[in-house]
């Protein structure tokens, strides 16, 4: 069932409730992430059940992800020196547009691949954020990974792939990217780590054992993503 993909939203919201509480005012960057996550959770099912994403639609989703990121962190970006502001703002926009657009175009039709991408992105972002000095954003990322694991596990047990679609893909990848950007702007995560994490969906798209049992596919594709996530964590380490 496509709505099973909302597990990542549930995991993220529960984590946020216990870490900082769910509030909407004052409108900080973290609370804007909350708003964007809820909006993505509403838009995803609409795309699956009422609309069919075309190439133009995917481009609009990618542009929306980039625009949402800049909206969430614009006040923080403006506080940086000019060169840093351009570098951080550009990295954030490019990373979010690419990872969300690529995942929706290339992975949304495969519940195992996109679940593995969200798992690796969530855990990788969470660990990188903790290394960079942000425990709260680290917990958000790990919660996202846990939600993605909850989406993958039933598929592995049943031996059948589940539908993911935009319901899972858009919020899962968007939240992972936003958490990474938050760790960059509000902690000490290097900008290039965000760009490396944006490649997790690409790694999961690489050829794999397509005819193997579902559980083995999940393991292999997750390992692909973990390699890239591990590189991002390793690059984050010297900056801590």
Question: Which residue stretches match the model-derived regions?
Answer:
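N-terminal topogenic module of multi-pass integral membrane proteins
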Residues: 1-107, 205-240
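Generic multipass alpha-helical transmembrane bundles of integral membrane proteins
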Residues: 62-185
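C-terminal transmembrane helix-loop-helix hairpin of multi-pass membrane proteins
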Residues: 138-145, 152-240
């Amino acid at each position: 069932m496509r709505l099973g993909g909302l597990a990542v939203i549930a995991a993220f919201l529960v984590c946020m409730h216990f870490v900082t509480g769910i509030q909407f005012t004052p409108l900080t960057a973290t609370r804007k992430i909350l708003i964007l996550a809820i909006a993505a959770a509403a838009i995803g099912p609409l795309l699956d059940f009422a609309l069919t994403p075309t190439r133009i639609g995917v481009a609009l989703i990618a542009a929306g992800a980039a625009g949402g990121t800049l909206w969430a962190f614009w006040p923080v970006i403006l506080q940086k020196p000019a060169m840093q502001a351009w570098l951080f703002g550009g990295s954030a926009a490019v990373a979010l547009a690419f990872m969300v657009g690529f995942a929706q175009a290339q992975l949304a039709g495969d519940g195992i691949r996109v679940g593995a991408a969200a798992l690796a992105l969530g855990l990788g972002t969470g660990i990188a954020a903790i290394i960079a000095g942000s425990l709260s954003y680290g917990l958000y990322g790990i919660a996202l990974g846990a939600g993605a694991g909850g989406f993958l596990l039933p598929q592995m047990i049943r031996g059948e792939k589940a539908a993911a679609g935009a319901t899972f893909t858009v919020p899962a990848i968007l939240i992972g990217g936003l958490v990474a950007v938050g760790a960059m702007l509000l902690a000490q995560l290097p900008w290039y780590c965000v760009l490396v994490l944006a490649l997790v969906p690409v790694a999961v798209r690489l050829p794999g054992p397509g005819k193997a049992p579902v559980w083995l596919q999940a393991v292999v594709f997750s390992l692909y993503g973990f390699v890239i996530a591990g590189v991002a964590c390793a690059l984050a380490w010297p900056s801590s």
